[in-house]
Regions:
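N-terminal non-catalytic accessory region
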Residues: 16-181, 185-197
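Bacterial N-terminal signal peptides
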Residues: 2-10
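Sec/Tat signal peptide C-region and signal peptidase I cleavage site
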Residues: 11-15
Length: 197
C-alpha cells in the first residue's frame, strides 16, 4: 500500500453553518492514551504565553492530519526533528470523535451538542504555534485510543472536522491561511475540506 502526503494552502473564510461547542472531558484524557492495560503519554504543548512572545518561524501554521487506523502521534518523529533542528513550536492537538453517537448505522455532519450528532470536538490546550495536530483517534468520552471507529468515518465528516481545526488555528495565530499536510486518508480529509467548505 502506497502512502503519500498532500500539501494544500487554504485561505477559506470563517463562515460556519453551526456554532461549535467544545465538549468537556477529564483532563487526563488530553495528555494520555489508555490502550489495553497501558498508559502512553501524548505530545503536549509547552505553555509559552508567560515565558516569551511567540514568533513563528513560518509564514503560515501547519496542520498535520493522520491517516486511516492511525493517530496524531504518527507525526511525532517528524515534528520532534522540526522542533530540534528548526526550533518549531507545537501549538496543540485537536481531538475530534467522528462517531460520537456510537451508532454505526447512521451518519451526519452535526456537531455536539446537537442531539444525535456524529462529531464531538473536545476542549484542549491550544496556543500560538508553528504546527498543530488533528486527531480522529478519539472516543465519545474524549479519551484517546478509539473503540468506536472514529478513524474509519466518512471523509465528509473528516472534512467538517478539519474545518473546525483550521478555523481555530486561524483564530489563535491571527493568520489568514494554513498549510494542511495529510498522510493517506488525512490528505483526502484535507481535500474534502478544501472542496466542500
Amino acid at each position: 500500500v502506497a502512502s503519500f502526503a498532500f500539501l494544500f494552502i487554504s485561505s477559506i473564510g470563517f463562515s460556519q453553518n453551526q456554532r461549535i461547542e467544545f465538549k468537556p472531558r477529564p483532563a487526563e484524557f488530553e495528555y494520555f492514551e489508555y490502550r489495553n492495560d497501558s498508559i502512553f503519554p501524548l505530545k503536549t504543548p509547552i505553555d509559552n504565553s508567560a515565558s516569551r512572545v511567540f514568533e513563528s518561524k513560518l509564514p503560515y501554521p501547519i496542520i498535520f492530519i493522520h491517516g486511516l487506523n492511525s493517530s496524531s502521534e504518527t507525526w511525532n518523529d517528524a515534528t520532534d526533528y522540526y522542533d530540534t533542528q528548526y526550533s518549531f513550536t507545537y501549538g496543540g492537538r485537536f481531538d475530534l470523535c467522528l462517531n460520537a453517537d456510537n451508532n454505526n448505522a447512521t451518519t451526519n455532519k452535526n456537531f455536539f451538542p446537537t442531539a444525535g450528532a456524529d462529531i464531538a470536538a473536545f476542549e484542549s490546550f491550544v496556543q500560538n504555534g508553528d504546527y498543530y495536530y488533528v486527531n480522529f483517534n478519539v472516543n465519545p468520552n474524549g479519551s484517546v485510543g478509539t473503540t468506536v471507529l472514529s478513524n474509519q468515518s466518512a471523509v465528509a465528516k473528516q472534512g467538517a472536522a478539519v474545518k473546525v481545526a483550521v478555523q481555530r488555528v486561524m483564530a489563535v495565530t491571527g493568520k489568514d491561511k494554513v498549510i494542511l499536510v495529510g498522510h493517506s486518508m488525512g490528505g483526502l480529509a484535507s481535500r474534502e475540506y478544501i472542496q466542500n467548505s
